[in-house]
């Protein structure tokens, strides 16, 4: 757990550097230098990676890939789904791992591998154990899917800060002092700053306190951490909707609705709460998901677990685009798009409230599956 905390801390430090330094360089000193510095940095990082190639540990895979074994077992299981497996003494064989009491498909003995009682030579006994083990591993992978699906709405919310939050900020007063103006994209730095400040506090203060209270080495379970982060994403969307309502009211009161190029006399600090809340949400949910999908898959499928984690945000981004395009098509037909080019005539507040509602629904579904999930025994 601590490893994933500090790993994500390092990523956010890099993001923060890019937002605070590179954005300023690109806006004020030119794009050549703005792209040249990241190129040099990546070359340096690649050199460090290559220097360590001789000391990296690499474990060769088994003769047969675990994913292939699982696929073969599933095919055989479906072929024999109506049959039961009995031991030579006539007793029903028990599952190897207790977690499958949660997985009814296996518990009902409808998905088993047939091993005839007279085929009791050691090679076949080993094959039977391997098949049963692979079935348990396949069941474990299937049990991850409801959690995966319930987190998709969080990924839709995750796609909004780099886009609409930034667009909101571009319409506000962003000057600090008389000469310095914060670039709109740099507002994302509030999320990274929050994560960089929160993770050390969480890892060094909150986790030990939680460990003493619960006895869990991580303070709270992985699913509890994810759930708290998802709840905070709901709060972040609600706060963003309230701030947007205030921004639109300011534009109407000052007669600036049709002057989108004029910065509203409303400070960018109004946006800080939604950024900070979302930053804490991201620190909890993102790290929790990484740890969960890495820890709960079979050892031979760790890369698949991380792929499942990444796919949440890939599919979530696609769902966000689909949702926005659908809403835009519907609202344009009614004469007033929620996503008008003139943000003073748009209704991002409605969109944020909609996402908050979807997030509540997603959180309820998540809690339903999370409370019954049985962790893999280590």
Residue ranges and their predicted role:
Residues 1-378:
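Hydrophobic transmembrane alpha-helices of multi-pass solute transporters/permeases
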């Amino acid at each position: 757990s601590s490893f994933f905390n500090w790993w994500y801390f390092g990523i956010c430090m890099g993001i923060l550097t890019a937002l605070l330094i590179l954005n300023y360089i690109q806006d004020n000193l030119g794009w050549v230098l703005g792209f040249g510095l990241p190129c040099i940095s990546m070359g340096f990082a690649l050199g460090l990676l290559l220097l360590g190639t001789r000391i990296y540990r690499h474990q060769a895979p088994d003769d047969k890939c675990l994913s292939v074994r699982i696929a073969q077992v599933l095919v055989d299981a479906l072929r024999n789904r109506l049959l039961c497996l009995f031991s030579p003494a006539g007793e029903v064989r028990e599952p190897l791992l207790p977690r499958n009491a949660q997985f009814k498909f296996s518990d009902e003995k409808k998905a088993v591998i047939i091993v005839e009682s007279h085929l009791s030579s050691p090679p076949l006994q080993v094959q039977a154990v391997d098949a049963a083990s692979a079935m348990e591993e396949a069941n474990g992978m299937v049990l991850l899917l409801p959690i995966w699906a319930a987190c998709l709405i969080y990924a839709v919310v995750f796609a909004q800060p780099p886009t609409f939050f930034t667009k909101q900020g571009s319409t506000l007063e962003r000057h600090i002092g008389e000469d310095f103006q914060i670039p709109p994209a740099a507002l994302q730095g509030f999320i990274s700053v929050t994560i960089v400040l929160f993770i050390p506090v969480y890892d060094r203060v909150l986790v030990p306190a939680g460990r003493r209270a619960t006895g869990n080495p991580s303070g709270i379970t992985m699913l509890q951490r994810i759930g708290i982060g998802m709840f905070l994403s709901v709060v972040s969307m609600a706060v963003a909707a309230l701030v947007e309502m205030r921004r639109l009211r300011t534009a109407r009161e000052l007669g600036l609705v049709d002057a989108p190029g004029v910065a509203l006399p409303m400070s960018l600090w109004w946006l800080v709460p939604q950024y900070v809340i979302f930053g804490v949400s991201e620190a909890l949910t993102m790290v929790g998901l990484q740890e969960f999908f890495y820890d709960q898959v079979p050892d031979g499928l760790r890369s698949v677990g991380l792929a499942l984690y990444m796919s949440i945000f890939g599919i979530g981004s696609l769902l966000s685009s689909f949702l926005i395009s659908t809403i835009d098509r519907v609202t344009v037909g009614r004469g007033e798009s929620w996503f008008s080019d003139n943000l003073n005539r748009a209704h991002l507040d409605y969109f944020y409230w909609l996402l908050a509602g979807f997030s509540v629904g997603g959180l309820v579904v998540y809690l339903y599956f999370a409370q019954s999930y049985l962790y893999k025994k280590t």
